[in-house]
Amino acid sequence: MEPIRIGIGGPVGAGKTMLVEKLTRAMHKELSIAVVTNDIYTKEDAQFLLKHGVLPADRVIGVETGGCPHTAIREDASMNFPAIDELKERHPDLELIFIESGGDNLAATFSPELVDFSIYIIDVAQGEKIPRKGGQGMIKSVLFIINKIDLAPYVGASLEVMERDTLAARGDKPYIFTNLKDEIGLAEVLEWIKTNALLYGLES
């Protein structure tokens, strides 16, 4: 059976790599997991995961995309496929692959050929206007995460305004407020993945 592929996108510094690290740490004992990271000219995110995470090196592959990072997840997603195939060859029992995009703008989206589900993450420090600006990454993602809520008082951002604008832009599509550093909201993200992507709890 093919592993489920979940894309994680968002601007530089929003918390993509930390989200991947927290999710893999929480799930690696119950699932066979691997990660593909996309960086423009380095493999820094992959190296961070290997240093701070729980997955061994043979389960993490860094792809150097060059140029615009959204190209590697949308227009020319093919550069990710060899990494996915290599991970599947190394681990025939693979059940879940996280594909982290390089930091990009609000318009970046994942090709449906590359991922089964997409998560888009922003952080409060970028300003409360971000949800109002919309952007295809935020609007089209299956799950939207607003991270670093602990910083709201320090940057003058209103979580109520961000929630209102998120509802206006996304309708009834799910969103979660998080402070991943302190794992606030992490349980809700895990629950969403297990229920919606992995279909936990469904009768066979």
From Swiss-Prot:
Cell compartments where the protein resides: Cytoplasm
Keyword Secreted in annotation: no
GO terms for cellular component: cytoplasm
A GO molecular-function descriptor: nickel cation binding
One example of a Gene Ontology biological process annotation: urea catabolic process
Claim: Nucleotide-binding is one of the keywords in the record: yes
Keywords associated with the record: Chaperone, Cytoplasm, GTP-binding, Nickel insertion, Nucleotide-binding
Binding residues for GTP: G10, P11, V12, G13, A14, G15, K16, T17
SUPFAM superfamilies cross-referenced by the UniProt entry: P-loop containing nucleoside triphosphate hydrolases
Domain of life: Bacteria
NCBIfam families for this protein: ureG (TIGR00101)
Subunit structure: Homodimer. UreD, UreF and UreG form a complex that acts as a GTP-hydrolysis-dependent molecular chaperone, activating the urease apoprotein by helping to assemble the nickel containing metallocenter of UreC. The UreE protein probably delivers the nickel.
Similarity comment: family membership: Belongs to the SIMIBI class G3E GTPase family. UreG subfamily.
Protein name from the UniProt record: Urease accessory protein UreG
Species annotation: Bacillus sp. (strain TB-90)
Gene name as annotated: ureG
